[in-house]
């Protein structure tokens, strides 16, 4: 059974408040990443791009789990949770050693990280400042939302190419 079976696409709002448009775009990006992983086997999710790239759809899910947790839990809330996958010593671990990885667990961790991020977005204003600074500067939740759109946009392009190489599927 595929780790990601059925995903309802979440389309972004075309109008509304800044908050509504920002979070609907982030939500859209999350749903597209899951759509790119939908109905694929473990082997297909672990399939790497053309060398020397280490990218895979499963690696992208692991990476975006880390990104969600870092920006919403660690940076904004100040959570002391340790690294999700990569560490200072092993910065590319999101994409490495996938052969023995349980894909269902990776998907569950991604979904859980997104749920926690949604909770932060629902209960805080865009102009609120994160607990942690970056480069000595305050970080607003607004910045985090925009950064998430940028981060997803970069990796959704990768996901498009990876999925097309697996089974010819395009769009999303």
Question: What kind of feature is each model-predicted range?
Answer:
Residues 1-12, 19-92, 132-172:
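Short, contiguous alpha-helical
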Residues 92-131, 142-148:
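Acidic/histidine-rich alpha-helical segments that form the ligand environment
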